[in-house]
C-alpha cells in the first residue's frame, strides 16, 4: 500500500510500483489523502489542455478534484495499481504547519484512520510505503506519513506490514538524508539500516538506448494539470531510495532486502560489459 497526500506524489515511487506489479506480479494499492483541488499554481498549460481557467482558484477547486482523479487513475494504470482509495480530504492550501491536519481541525482524521484500519485488516499488505518524513515540507505530506505510521502501529493482526519511506535522488545529487520529524517519535528512521535502493538510470536494449526512467516519465506525463512536476522531474531521477522506520522489527530488514534484490533482478537487466 502506497500512502500519499496528493495525486502525483506517488511518482517518487513509480518505478518500484511498476516493477512490483508488472515484473514480480505483485499487487499495489494506493491511499490518497486529499482531493487535489489546491494544485492550481502551475496549471497554466494544463488550463489550455483542459479548456478551463484552472489558475483561477474558484474554478480550480470546482474542477481539479475530478481532473486530478482521472490523472491519477491514468498514472495508476501505467504502474499497474489495483485500487486507489481516495480519502477526500480538502487540499486547502500550502503550509508547512501540519498541526491543523494531524489534529483534526482541517481534516477528518477519524475517517482516515477507520478506512486505513479496514484496508490493513482486509488486505494484509506486506509493505506500506510513505512519503519522506522531514521538516520543511508540505503539512499534507507530513500528515499522510503519520497516518500511515499510526495505522501500522494500531494494526492488531498477525501479519503486521513493514513500513518504509521513499525518496528520490536526482541526477548528480547526494543521497537524501532522512532521520524523521523532530517531536514526532513515530516518524523516526532507523539510521543504522542503510537505505534500500532502486536504480532507474541503468541502460539496456540495443546500444543502451533505454532506461526505467521512461516508466517514470510515462507516469509524470499523465499529470497535465501539474506543470512544475513535468518541468522539474521528467527524466531527472536516477534512484529511488527507501528508508526503514524505527517502529519496524529489526528482523524485518531481511524482508525489505529481498524485495529490492528481487526488483534488481527482474525485468530488463544492464547489457553485459564488453
Predicted segments with their positions:
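Metal-dependent de-N-acetylase/amidase catalytic core
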Residues: 1-3, 99-105, 109-274
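Active-site rim/loop-helix segments in enzyme catalytic domains that contact anionic ligands
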Residues: 1-123, 149-150
